[in-house]
Amino acid sequence: MQQKTKLFLQALKYSIPHLGKCMQKQHLNHYNFADHYYNRIKLKKYHLTKCLQNKPKISELARNIPSRSFSCKDLQPVKQENEKPLPENMDAFEKVRTKLETQPQEEYEIINVEVKHGGFVYYQEGCCLVRSKDEEADNDNYEVLFNLEELKLDQPFIDCIRVAPDEKYVAAKIRTEDSEASTCVIIKLSDQPVMEASFPNVSSFEWVKDEEDEDVLFYTFQRNLRCHDVYRATFGDNKRNERFYTEKDPSYFVFLYLTKDSRFLTINIMNKTTSEVWLIDGLSPWDPPVLIQKRIHGVLYYVEHRDDELYILTNVGEPTEFKLMRTAADTPAIMNWDLFFTMKRNTKVIDLDMFKDHCVLFLKHSNLLYVNVIGLADDSVRSLKLPPWACGFIMDTNSDPKNCPFQLCSPIRPPKYYTYKFAEGKLFEETGHEDPITKTSRVLRLEAKSKDGKLVPMTVFHKTDSEDLQKKPLLVQVYGAYGIDLKMNFRPERRVLVDDGWILAYCHVRGGGELGLQWHADGRLTKKLNGLADLEACIKTLHGQGFSQPSLTTLTAFSAGGVLAGALCNSNPELLRAVTLEAPFLDVLNTMMDTTLPLTLEELEEWGNPSSDEKHKNYIKHYCPYQNIKPQHYPSIHITAYENDERVPLKGIVSYTEKLKEAIAEHAKDTGEGYQSPNIILDIQPGGNHVIEDSHKKITAQIKFLYEELGLDSTSVFEDLKKYLKF
């Protein structure tokens, strides 16, 4: 199924779900991004010359979508106050940053969205959509199908690829780094590939073949960050394009995917807590869809298919965690669902993959990774505990019924390949060079006791040869919203910090999803303060166990993680020296009371409805970062915001920054002469995408800020960063 279940589980929190097999990014509602782009850069030369030698023709019927442009002319970043003298090593920093920013563009390539179909592999090479024979996929021998520059977009990349069943057509969704707008192009495959059509603002899309051997493209249309409409289209001599489903409830969104065996196309209608699935027969796609189970508040379910049976991952029944059930495809209603497999307590289902004779579950149990292999013939279960250093899965595109490949990674260790072979019943590890980080660093699984006695898991990294950890700098990371896990995929800048002696601590607080659905439920709505208490307990526990001290402790958060980070700055600023926030959500109350914002209704079950519920309003007032700013000492804070971010509007971040500076100035006045005010920096970046690529400039600016605030020498760290960015 290649990530489809993972995307389903994440889509419970997302408003623009993107489907599996194409390894694309998922976009959250107002405030978060599920899978950042950290794994999308690799070292490889573009082949632009060859790419442009075979430019495809463009049909006159195809619609070119105009490019979007943005301007910062009317927006000025807030200046840094109380600037400190430049450190002696500033020349070294500037030199390295210049090197990073001026690396030849052709040396870096977006990791290909790669799809295997028939005897070909379809992927992006430079600025082009290409395909090559499977056995030649690693060579330069490929056929150019479409030049992305024809769309006149700024630095476009392919986000998803779908190939029609008989390879007459290929559809590709194309977008840019600085915008969430996308274009789906349809390419007719022939000796001279032609762009048949293009559709703007497509979210999910899938191909099926009808009874007359005609390819039918189903796709969802996104409007104002909402995805409510489903269309189907045909091409060639019998062109059609019609809308056949519209979701009327604005709190729900719609996305599509095929079951792994392509037997059914599923229409998934869902919000944060409830889902409904309709089936379209892959053999007769013009027939009306069949409802599996009408939406029931609080019941989530996802559907896969094998041998005329539906396998349903659902939270129905007790306990209210995900479990696997099955039923005959011709009797899909909930009263016919039979329990097939249950998860242990404190278990998160990360992904599910269906094979001919096996079902593979990728799990996180008590903050450790497992793979469960279920034999569908005899209901046998084989549970494999994965290496303790592993913190994240990367699912691999796979159509081989004999093997289940995947990758494991951690924030400081690049992905490593593993393959489970069903015949041998064993897990095989990629052989070759062993990463030295395995010997030079340690990973610890710790727990902190929160205010109410709940044990909160933490994942901690540090160098094995570090002496006196209490004197080492500490970087804490938090999220705690939407039931989404902290992102723990490989990040070169995190590895560089550990190499330079830093301690990294990932705090898996309530509101996230690390311990299952209940862990999320215990940190949303009127339980949001649990997440804040958890974060406070984690930092105090780390200090109590000898990991760093407040004067060397920093905190970082992205998007909705800004709620807990900002709240901690208000309630316990003495625990922190410096904070970095990226596209942070900081004004919960005013945002959730503004129903004109496109995603407010979809967010009600996460934050509450302060417009109609006084209890929710008063509770949000109690923790909202913007509402609780007061004259006191604050840690230094570096905020990165994006000019046209539709999910976290710039206006709210600017208001927060101004109010914070006023409070700091008032506190400084009351404190008197000699008080050293913290630095508050607002870095406004151009662009309208909530999911901005981690540029060298942004990474180096954030690390520079942390080193300066802690008074550390950053000479070596930037040289190391340059090296690791070439992984």
Swiss-Prot record:
UniProt KW keywords: Cytoplasm, Cytoskeleton, Golgi apparatus, Hydrolase, Nucleus, Protease, Serine protease
Compartment(s) where it occurs, according to its Swiss-Prot or TrEMBL record: Cytoplasm, Cytosol; Golgi apparatus, trans-Golgi network; Cytoplasm, Cytoskeleton; Golgi apparatus
GO biological process, one term: proteolysis
EC assignment: 3.4.21.-
GO molecular-function terms, A-Z: peptidase activity; serine-type endopeptidase activity
GO CC terms in record: cytoskeleton; cytosol; nucleus; trans-Golgi network
Active site: S559, D645, H690
Pfam family, one: Peptidase_S9
Main localization, broad class: cytoplasm
PANTHER family: PROLYL ENDOPEPTIDASE-LIKE, PROTEASE FAMILY S9A OLIGOPEPTIDASE
Subunit composition and interactions: Homodimer. Interacts with the AP-1 complex.
Family: Belongs to the peptidase S9A family.
Functional description taken from the UniProt entry: Serine peptidase whose precise substrate specificity remains unclear. Does not cleave peptides after a arginine or lysine residue. Regulates trans-Golgi network morphology and sorting by regulating the membrane binding of the AP-1 complex. May play a role in the regulation of synaptic vesicle exocytosis.
Name the UniProt record assigns to this protein: Prolyl endopeptidase-like
Upper lineage: Eukaryota, Metazoa, Chordata, Craniata, Vertebrata
